[in-house]
Amino acid sequence: MLDIKLFREQADTVKSKIELRGDDPKVVDEVLELDNERRQLIGKTEEMKARRNKVSEEIAEKKRNKENADDVIKEMRELGDEIKENDAKLNEVDNKVRDILIRIPNLIAEDVPQGDSDEENVEVKKWGTPREFDFEPKAHWDLVEELKMADFERAAKISGARFVYLTKDGALLERALMNYMLTKHTTQHGYTEMMTPQLVNADTMFGTGQLPKFEEDLFKVEKEGLYTIPTAEVPLTNFYRDEIIQPGVLPEKFTAQTACFRSEAGSAGRDTRGLIRLHQFDKVEMVRIEKPEDSWDALEDMTQNAEAILEELGLPYRRVILCTGDIGFSASKTYDLEVWLPSYDNYKEISSCSNCTDFQARRANIRFKRDAASKPELAHTLNGSGLAVGRTFAAIVENYQNADGSITIPEALVPFMGGKTEIRPVND
C-alpha cells in the first residue's frame, strides 16, 4: 500500500507511475478529493470538541453559581450528536480512501523498462548455451510417463486437470531438488530455513497483496475462512506482521519449501501439458526483510542466489527485467530467470525475484528500530523463487535426456539422489 503523503506531495509522480502500469491515473484525484474532505471533517470535529470542552466548563461554572444551565446543557447534547455524526462521516471517508489505496499497485522503480506485455521485458544476462541434440528430443511430459516418473492420468481421476502424481524416480528427483536447493541456500547463501503454515487467513493474504485484488487466483476453505498459499512468500513475509523488529535483527533471510496452490484463472489453454502450470506444485522460496537503504543490493544478491542453483545444475538460462506492463502488483522491480526448455524451443520462467520496497510492509505493518531510542520505520521486503521445483524438474529431464530414453542426473544432485547418476527406462 502506498503512503497517502505521496499523493499529497508528489501527485504528478504517482499519476505517471500508475499510468505506466496501464492503470487510470484519475484515481489519484479521487484520493486527494477524499483526503481533503477527510481533513475538513477532522478540522470541524476538533472545533466542535473544543467548543464542547468550553461548554462543559460553562455548565460547571453555572452549577457552582447555582444558575440555570439548561441552555448550555442542550448545546452540549447537540454538540455530542454532531460529533458522533461527523465521526461516522469521517469513518465512511476513511474507508473509501483505504478501499482505493489497497487496490493501487506499488510505484515502479526508475530503471524498470516501459512496455505493455512480457514481449517487452528486457534481457540483461544470458548464461549457458542450449544443447544441440543429435537426436529428436522429447518433451518432459512424454519422458516422465515413459520412465514411470509421473502419472497425469491417475491424478486427473483423483483431482482433475493440472495435477500430477510423481512416482518412483520422479518422486526421488523432486525430493532431491528440494533438499539440494534448501541446503544450498542455508549453508552457502545464509538463509534460515522455515517450515510454514500452508493455510493462512485473509489478513495475511492482504499483507502481501494477494487480497483483495487477486482473490480469484486463490483457493479458499470457505468454512474456516482460510486460503491455501500460492507461494511461501505469503507466510514468510508475514512472519513479522504487526510487529516492531528490534535493533540488530535485520537483515532477515528466510527460505522455505512448500506446496503452492493456484487456480490459474485466466490461463485456460496455456501450458496445458506437463509440469509447467499446475494447480499444486512445489517451490523453494527466499524472502528477505531489509533496511530501506539495503534493499536494492539485496535484490541483486537474492537473484544471484537463484542463478547459482541454475548454474550448478548446468541449466542454460537468461535474466530479464520485467517491463511496466508485466510487473506484479506488489513489486517495484522484478527480475525473472527463464530456463531453456527444448520442448518449447524457448526460455520459460523458473524464478521471479522482486523488491517490494515498503509496499507490503505498510500493508502488513512490519516495522523495525535502528536503535533503542529511534522511532519505528517501515522495513523493505523482497521475495524470490529459489527455485520453482517442478519447472526445474522439467528442465533437467529435457536438457539431460539421452538418445536411449534415459536421463543423466546433474553432478550436483547425485548426493541427494542416493548416489544415483541416471534414470533409465524401467525395462532396462
Swiss-Prot record:
Assigned EC number: 6.1.1.11
Entry's localization field: Cytoplasm
UniProt pathway annotation: Aminoacyl-tRNA biosynthesis; selenocysteinyl-tRNA(Sec) biosynthesis; L-seryl-tRNA(Sec) from L-serine and tRNA(Sec): step 1/1
Gene3D superfamilies: Bira Bifunctional Protein, Domain 2 (3.30.930.10), Serine-tRNA synthetase, tRNA binding domain (1.10.287.40)
Cellular component terms (Gene Ontology): cytoplasm
Molecular-function GO terms, alphabetical: ATP binding; catalytic activity, acting on a protein; serine-tRNA ligase activity; transferase activity
Record Pfam families: Seryl_tRNA_N, tRNA-synt_2b
GO biological process terms on file: selenocysteine biosynthetic process; seryl-tRNA aminoacylation
Keyword annotations: Aminoacyl-tRNA synthetase, ATP-binding, Cytoplasm, Ligase, Nucleotide-binding, Protein biosynthesis
Binding site for ATP: R262, S263, E264, E349, I350, S351, S352
Reactions it catalyzes: tRNA(Ser) + L-serine + ATP = L-seryl-tRNA(Ser) + AMP + diphosphate + H(+); tRNA(Sec) + L-serine + ATP = L-seryl-tRNA(Sec) + AMP + diphosphate + H(+)
HAMAP family: Ser_tRNA_synth_type1
Domain notes: Consists of two distinct domains, a catalytic core and a N-terminal extension that is involved in tRNA binding.
Role according to the record: Catalyzes the attachment of serine to tRNA(Ser). Is also able to aminoacylate tRNA(Sec) with serine, to form the misacylated tRNA L-seryl-tRNA(Sec), which will be further converted into selenocysteinyl-tRNA(Sec).
Similarity comment text for this entry: Belongs to the class-II aminoacyl-tRNA synthetase family. Type-1 seryl-tRNA synthetase subfamily.
Subunit structure: Homodimer. The tRNA molecule binds across the dimer.
Protein name, UniProt field: Serine--tRNA ligase
Gene: serS
